[in-house]
Amino acid sequence: MHFLKKSIFLVLFLGLVSLSICEKEKREDQNEEEVDENEEESEEKRGLMSVLGHAVGNVLGGLFKPKS
């Protein structure tokens, strides 16, 4: 009977450990995906701001250009 209790505890313990490891990896994967999405969004914003900056610069440059 004592051997059976130890076996059951061992199986339950190993099951909980493996479940814990799987959950941890799943959370890490989700965090990596969120970081990747945030990086893509920030790159899009930087690209948009760069394009807008050039457009505004061209417009202002055209307005203040000395007329010949």
From Swiss-Prot:
What tissues is it present in? Expressed by the granular skin glands.
Stretches for region Disordered: 26-47
What are the protein's UniProt keywords? Amphibian defense peptide, Antibiotic, Antimicrobial, Immunity, Innate immunity, Secreted, Signal
Please tell me whether the keyword Signal is annotated for this protein: yes
Signal sequence annotation: 1-22
Start-end of Acidic residues biased regions = 30-42
Tell me, what's a Pfam family for it?
FSAP_sig_propep
Q: Which domain of life is it from?
A: Eukaryota
GO cellular component, alphabetical, reads: extracellular region
Q: Biological process GO terms, please?
A: defense response to bacterium; innate immune response
Where is this gene product found? Answer: Secreted
Q: Which residues are trimmed away as propeptide when the chain matures?
A: 23-46
Its annotated function is as follows:
Antimicrobial peptide with activity against both Gram-positive and Gram-negative bacteria. Antibacterial activities have been tested against Bacillus cereus (MIC=12.5 ug/ml), Escherichia coli (MIC=50 ug/ml), Leuconostoc mesenteroides (MIC=25 ug/ml), Micrococcus luteus (MIC=1.5 ug/ml), Pastewella haemolytica (MIC=0.8 ug/ml), Staphylococcus aureus (MIC<l00 ug/ml), Streptococcus faecalis (MIC<150 ug/ml) and Streptococcus uberis (MIC=50 ug/ml). Strongly inhibits the formation of NO by neuronal nitric oxide synthase (nNOS) at micromolar concentrations.
The extra comment attached to this record reads: Forms an amphipathic alpha-helix over residues 47-60 while the C-terminal eight residues are more flexible and less structured. The flexible region may be responsible for the lack of antimicrobial activity.
- What family does the database annotate? Belongs to the frog skin active peptide (FSAP) family. Frenatin subfamily.
Q: What is this protein called?
A: Frenatin-3
